[in-house]
Amino acid sequence: MAAPISTVAESKELRGLNLIAAHSHIRGLGVDVDSLQPRPASQGLVGQEKARKAAAVILQMVKEGKIAGRAVLIAGPPSTGKTAIAMGMAQSLGPDVPFTMLAASEIFSMEMSKTEALTQAFRKSIGVRIKEESEIIEGEVVEIQIDRSVTGGNKQGKLTIKTTDMETIYDMGTKMIDSMTKERVMAGDIISIDKSSGKITKLGRSYARSRDYDAMGADVKFVQCPEGELQVRKEIVHTVSLHEIDVINSRSQGFLALFSGDTGEIRSEVRDQINVKVAEWKEEGKAEIIPGVLFIDEVHMLDIECYSYINRALEAELAPIVIMASNRGHSRIRGTTYNSPHGLPLDFLDRVVIVSTQHYSADEIRQILAIRAQEEEIDLSPDALALLTKIGQESNLRYASNIITTSHLLSQKRKAKEVSVDDVQRSYRLFYDPARSVKFVNQYEQRFIGDQGNVNFTASNGDAMEIS
């Protein structure tokens, strides 16, 4: 007798781009919506309550559209959560308010001038909410009849569609039949047809047809049959940035440049025409300007010409809120021989509202490391977390969060369920923090190649061919 054949169904789950970054655990600013009071630890942010309260006040004014053309500087030592606060603001703004994030070094390019890169960043941070009314046919498909010609000519058909109150038959042409076939529309589907563009949107399947099949796919969505008239007027809102409008109007390839990224230099005449047109739409009530947020990290890397441009751009009618971060104290302004606080020119510093960040306490470092471990799905023993907290205090928070991952890899090698103190100690010995690296360089300085390319070979352990 033949042995029974057993089959095992295998399914591969498609994973998206779900990488864990340095600030992927941040979900918002962690403040109370009504009072704007920061919670001690919420939405991935811990501590820095004064800075978070200041950021929440700015955020509230952005949402209400009461503030634009202002500059805010988040200043503080390294590893005090400056970028984290900016990421929290981006998460709290929502999808409609534009938020552009760039590092100061990104604007230096051989293909594009510095002022053009800054202009594009400013324009990306200003949104235009365009309202348009369109006539839509919305209802449940009762029947689709398609008459195909024997000679392969034009197809013709009839669509019977209904709501709970009425039923109508529409004649369909070739393009509409092709769209129906592409969307796989069948009797019992709830669809929406835009009369101006002919776009068909499949909203779901009618509850009345829920018993048509015994088995349904996970993507099948059941909705109620629409009520009232078949043809309704709906207001559709599109939110685009000024930069996107610039690109579409500046090149022969139009919107394709948005996907390729090859926008190049955009002429100022094009931008002026768009500004005039947007102002007309605003007066007619067709559009609404949404001033967004431009965040420039490591702002001390900008040079004096960039600061001069930002000075002027902040005074323009269409200007976003510019939030900057710097970890410098008294530093030289790039392009000059002058020293200035935070590396910013004094005339620009006068226009800036400064928010300061402080060093984290031991308890706050412990909470942040626990959140990071939870985000990376790593189990830490209490002793390991205590040791990491001590390392974070003595070295810096970034180094402590980095060796969480390496300690986890070491614990996996010995098939442990959680990271122990021994794993953290081994990682600490394997990977140097900045302080120990500097100590090592100072100790063996003569063996390293210097600025002039010199190296002292006599400082080595001796020649292998030396005869005593």
From Swiss-Prot:
One of its GO terms (biological process) is box C/D snoRNP assembly. Pfam families: TIP49 (PF06068), TIP49_C (PF17856). GO terms for molecular function: 3'-5' DNA helicase activity; 5'-3' DNA helicase activity; ATP binding; ATP hydrolysis activity; DNA helicase activity. Keywords: Activator, ATP-binding, Chromatin regulator, DNA damage, DNA repair, Helicase, Hydrolase, Nucleotide-binding, Nucleus, rRNA processing, Transcription, Transcription regulation. InterPro entries: AAA+_ATPase (IPR003593), P-loop_NTPase (IPR027417), RuvB-like (IPR027238), RuvB-like_C (IPR041048), RuvBL1/2_DNA/RNA_bd_dom (IPR042487), TIP49_P-loop (IPR010339). Its EC number is 3.6.4.12. It catalyses: ATP + H2O = ADP + phosphate + H(+). Gene3D superfamilies: 1.10.8.60, P-loop containing nucleotide triphosphate hydrolases (3.40.50.300), RuvB-like helicase, domain II (2.40.50.360). The keyword DNA repair applies. It is found in: Nucleus. GO terms for cellular component: Ino80 complex; NuA4 histone acetyltransferase complex; R2TP complex; Swr1 complex. ATP binds at residues 76-83. May form heterododecamers with RVB1. Component of the SWR1 chromatin remodeling complex, the INO80 chromatin remodeling complex, and of the R2TP complex. DNA helicase which participates in several chromatin remodeling complexes, including the SWR1 and the INO80 complexes. The SWR1 complex mediates the ATP-dependent exchange of histone H2A for the H2A variant HZT1 leading to transcriptional regulation of selected genes by chromatin remodeling. The INO80 complex remodels chromatin by shifting nucleosomes and is involved in DNA repair. Also involved in pre-rRNA processing. Belongs to the RuvB family. This is RuvB-like helicase 2. The gene is rvb2.
